Amino acid sequence: MAYSKLRRNTSQRKSLLRSLVSDLIIKEKIITTESKAKELQKKVEKVITLAKKKSLHHRRQVFKKLFDENINKEQTVTQKLFTTTAEKYMKRNGGYTRIIKTVPRRGDAAPMAIITFV
């Protein structure tokens, strides 16, 4: 399967994508570069598909793919994913996110995009 290296070594790329997946689940909308948004979309689609299955095995698989940080005092990222986000897309078979291209970033003219849940 082809993927973008994002000009980082393996550990940095995995950490970046885990962080972006967690942030997208928390905030439900992220502004980032186009290439990061495309890679993030692949990861988020897989994580939500795993979360919809709701077994212990799939929960452990999800823990590997994101940082489980606290959103507030009552809820963590995985709790929000398994309760709110997975329930929202239970009848949908993929296509949980959308990428909207925006104006290039000022300074280096990098192509920017907004990634959000549908």
UniProtKB/Swiss-Prot annotation:
Pfam families: Ribosomal_L17
This protein's record includes keyword Ribosomal protein: yes
Domain of life: Bacteria
GO biological-process terms attached to the record: translation
Entries under SUPFAM superfamilies matching the protein: Prokaryotic ribosomal protein L17
A GO CC annotation given for this chain: cytosolic large ribosomal subunit
InterPro entries the record matches: Ribosomal_bL17 (IPR000456), Ribosomal_bL17_CS (IPR047859), Ribosomal_bL17_sf (IPR036373)
GO molecular-function terms, A-Z: structural constituent of ribosome
Keywords assigned by UniProt, alphabetized: Ribonucleoprotein, Ribosomal protein
Subunit structure: Part of the 50S ribosomal subunit. Contacts protein L32.
Family that this chain belongs to: Belongs to the bacterial ribosomal protein bL17 family.
Protein name: Large ribosomal subunit protein bL17
